Amino acid sequence: MIYGVGTDIIQIARVQGVMERTNGRFAEKVLGPDELAKYHARKARSEKRGLAFLSTRFAAKEAFSKAIGLGMRWPMTWRAMELMNLPSGEPTPICHGELAAWLAERGLSVRVSVSDEHDFAVAFAIAERAGGAASQPTAL
């Protein structure tokens, strides 16, 4: 049953600007250790592909945080979720620490799709609850 959906789009030039202003530290803030290693490998081959990778991961984390209904609030942190690829190429979120426990307590799994094209990176996430009812809207 669908628990929540999230989407995000970012202009790759904005990420490039942040990287320039932070002397590259933005990647270290946003990417988990496995993502960071993959980012450096891609960047070594092509600056443009490295930037696209970073942008898709940023968008994926934003979309993921929206799908689970937390936004970027604890236990959802930049490095608590890494988006890696299965051997088939399918992107799969790997959650760590308290975020993994939070998702398990609620019986949630999340699927993420990412894409980039020249100027933009986009991500879409669907959070699902196994066998449970869909989340109900919360009155504000």
Swiss-Prot record:
It catalyses: apo-[ACP] + CoA = holo-[ACP] + adenosine 3',5'-bisphosphate + H(+). Its cofactor is Mg(2+). Mg(2+) binds at D8, E62. GO terms for biological process: fatty acid biosynthetic process. GO terms for molecular function: holo-[acyl-carrier-protein] synthase activity; magnesium ion binding. It is found in: Cytoplasm. InterPro entries: 4-PPantetheinyl_Trfase_dom, 4-PPantetheinyl_Trfase_dom_sf, ACPS, Ppantetheine-prot_Trfase_dom. The keyword Lipid metabolism applies. It holds the Pfam family ACPS. Keywords: Cytoplasm, Fatty acid biosynthesis, Fatty acid metabolism, Lipid biosynthesis, Lipid metabolism, Magnesium, Metal-binding, Transferase. It is an enzyme of class 2 (transferase). One of its GO terms (cellular component) is cytoplasm. The keyword Metal-binding applies. Transfers the 4'-phosphopantetheine moiety from coenzyme A to a Ser of acyl-carrier-protein. Belongs to the P-Pant transferase superfamily. AcpS family. This is Holo-[acyl-carrier-protein] synthase. The lineage of its organism: Bacteria, Pseudomonadati, Pseudomonadota, Betaproteobacteria, Burkholderiales.
